[in-house]
Amino acid sequence: MKAESGSADAKLPLPPPVGRKRRGLAILDFLLRLLAIGATLSAAIAMGTNNETLKFFTQFFQFNARFYNLSAFIYFVIANATVGLYLLLSLPFSIFDIVRPRAAAFRVLLIFFDTVMVAVCTSGAAAATAIMYVARRGNTKTNWFSICQQFNSFCDQATGALGASFAAVVLLILLVLLSASTLHRQRADF
């Protein structure tokens, strides 16, 4: 009977070692950071290079739409560039977490700053979204007219930058959740 129970135990799959799970989560953290860097920096570059000139009648009578004409767009560029720079500087800590998955001190530091960067990126994207809403739809009560009918490429490029920024917000939220999950698992293992 002992032989039968031993063979039944041999058929059960063994759970993966704890170190592999942690290392896998650390690699996922690193990849999410790379994606978020791409999203934030592409949003900042797309908005920072956004301008369009509309010529009326002659070359001397022109209307310009540039990102720096609106303070919300300036804040958007600064916020996304700041978050992108932070994510770039956090990569060595993420790599260290891959090498030493049991080090919780760096994970606590990353979860704190990741949460701050979620707020910074969200506020920049929200401010620019409010301006884009008025640019697309206007506001008849205040006599603000829609400019996107005339400045199509300006509005399209700004909308693309907003999409990249909101994608970065989602990636940052995933980073915070991943870090919280990793910290919770480390506490449970002790």
From Swiss-Prot:
GO biological process, one term: cell wall organization
Subcellular location: Cell membrane
Annotated transmembrane regions: 25-45, 73-93, 108-128, 158-178
Presence of the UniProt keyword Glycoprotein in the record: yes
Segments in the Cytoplasmic topological domain: 1-24, 94-107, 179-190
Membrane topology of this protein: Multi-pass membrane protein
Keywords: Cell membrane, Cell wall biogenesis/degradation, Glycoprotein, Membrane, Transmembrane, Transmembrane helix
Glycosylation sites: N51, N69
Pfam families per the UniProt record, alphabetical: CASP_dom
Domain of life: Eukaryota
Role according to the record: Regulates membrane-cell wall junctions and localized cell wall deposition. Required for establishment of the Casparian strip membrane domain (CSD) and the subsequent formation of Casparian strips, a cell wall modification of the root endodermis that determines an apoplastic barrier between the intraorganismal apoplasm and the extraorganismal apoplasm and prevents lateral diffusion.
Protein name: Casparian strip membrane protein 1
Source organism phylogeny: Eukaryota, Viridiplantae, Streptophyta, Embryophyta, Tracheophyta
